[in-house]
Amino acid sequence: MMSYKSIMQTFLILFILAVSLQPSGSQSEMADDDLEIIEIIEPSWLLVTTISPSYSSDLVADFKALTGSQEFPDHLMAEDAEKAEGDFDVSLYFTVLDRLSMTGGRVLDYVYDYAGIGGAPVLYARKAVAPPYRNYSEYIAADSAVKPEVREDYYLRYIETDGTPEGFFQLALLLIQGEQFYQFWHAAYNDDAIVSDLEDARASLGGGLFGADEPTVEALLADLGKFDLAPVVSMSGDLVKVEVVIFTDWGGFVRRSIVMEKELPHLILEERSEVLVPYDCGIMF
């Protein structure tokens, strides 16, 4: 049996070991400080440009006009639907997005993804000399090792800007609203639309299928008046950040920030969203 003295000596040794294994207060604080530094580091944006609200508003309106009058073709309402002659031609986008161009001998095209409870186009870039994919299944099978959500922005690799702030704003517009045509049922939840000023915001709230009543519109606009809605494009070294305010019937007014590579291919590196003024139309379908 151990003596009282032996027990106390053993306890003392264990206590010393336990204390020695704990990180010191300064070490813990240093680790926390390091984590904070990592979280707040951002590029020093050397060139920050506010896009004219009149320019951006007119551009968005012209872009919407390309697809706004398109009627949904009955032949697309089926799984593995195939496009037909006379369906919308997405190459028309470049008549409005005049600071963008296709590269690498590619053209912009789309297949239609119909799934019973919803349907929407999926943009992709193909070689101009290659035949288009017949349907969505053929598109998926062409690169089955890659999940569709991973390659949803692949087409951007073949779209080049002219390097100006307006060019990168046009690229963001294509990314946000480029697949908003021939939307069926649940796909209509993808309704993000860029707004550039309070006039755009009012039109967004009062228009569409789910327009808000006048008191609600005025209250929301009063809250939104605290913010500058004009798009902003920031550049630094090999990075570009595009910030726009969008409106959605299922979320309200949201500032979206997109960081991408300045040089081709303009890979999307980060996307963030911040709700400025919340709103929900209350419609579910």
Annotate each PLM feature.
Residues 230-285:
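C-terminal, beta-strand-rich globular interaction domains
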Residues 33-225:
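Extended, low-hydrophobicity segments enriched in charged/polar residues
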Residues 10-20:
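Bacterial N-terminal signal peptides
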Residues 2-3, 46, 186, 251:
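Short linear interaction motif-like sites in intrinsically disordered regions of transcription factors
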Residues 1-11:
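Bacterial N-terminal signal peptides that target proteins for export
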Residues 23-28:
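Boundary at the C-terminal end of the N-terminal hydrophobic targeting segment
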